[in-house]
Amino acid sequence: MSVLVPMVVEQTSRGERAYDIYSRLLKDRVIFLVGQVEDHMANLAIAQMLFLESENPNKDINLYINSPGGAVTSAMAIYDTMQFVKPDVRTLCIGQAASAGALLLAGGAKGKRHCLPHSSVMIHQVLGGYQGQGTDIQIHAKQTQRVSDQLNQILAKHTGKDIERVEKDTNRDYFLTPEEAVEYGLIDSIFKERP
């Protein structure tokens, strides 16, 4: 399926310049994470963050998230880059931030993590499905548990909740309204209008 990306035209001293909407917003330091978190999305988001850091290491990067989650390894690559780059990464949930999306939302700079009023946030444990020999399944189960523990530690760090509480809450799908996400410590505020 082909998707039409809107173009915007800007007047410059040298005439008109046409941009696709996402390139134009990137000039304003806005990155979109929309849809399943996977390797291609992670590659683009990481490249954009590194580019914006090289352009101005002292100006915030704005990460708009509308994601049902996805591949943990891709999410961890984005998360690690968010922590690695010098600029603060502001996060804003614009629809849903579930699973890996919630991890990225919470991983924004403290005081700069937000939701729009009708957004939804969901945390849960790592999902995995494996087949094969019993020993291979055991190996994958141990790896899944290790990654799950790692993600719970990250959520505990960013929310200020103790690890036991995070483990209990991520044991099943745990949905939060924006107000509940503020109380939990996943975000810092709800944007009801542009600040």
Swiss-Prot record:
InterPro entries documented for this protein: ClpP, ClpP/crotonase-like_dom_sf, ClpP/TepA, ClpP_Ser_AS
Protein name: ATP-dependent Clp protease proteolytic subunit
Keyword annotations from UniProtKB, A to Z: Cytoplasm, Hydrolase, Protease, Serine protease
Main localization (coarse): cytoplasm
Subcellular location, record wording: Cytoplasm
Family as reported in the entry's similarity comment: Belongs to the peptidase S14 family.
Catalysed transformations (reactions): Hydrolysis of proteins to small peptides in the presence of ATP and magnesium. alpha-casein is the usual test substrate. In the absence of ATP, only oligopeptides shorter than five residues are hydrolyzed (such as succinyl-Leu-Tyr-|-NHMec, and Leu-Tyr-Leu-|-Tyr-Trp, in which cleavage of the -Tyr-|-Leu- and -Tyr-|-Trp bonds also occurs)
UniProt cross-references to CDD domains, sorted A to Z: S14_ClpP_2 (cd07017)
Organism: Coxiella burnetii (strain RSA 493 / Nine Mile phase I)
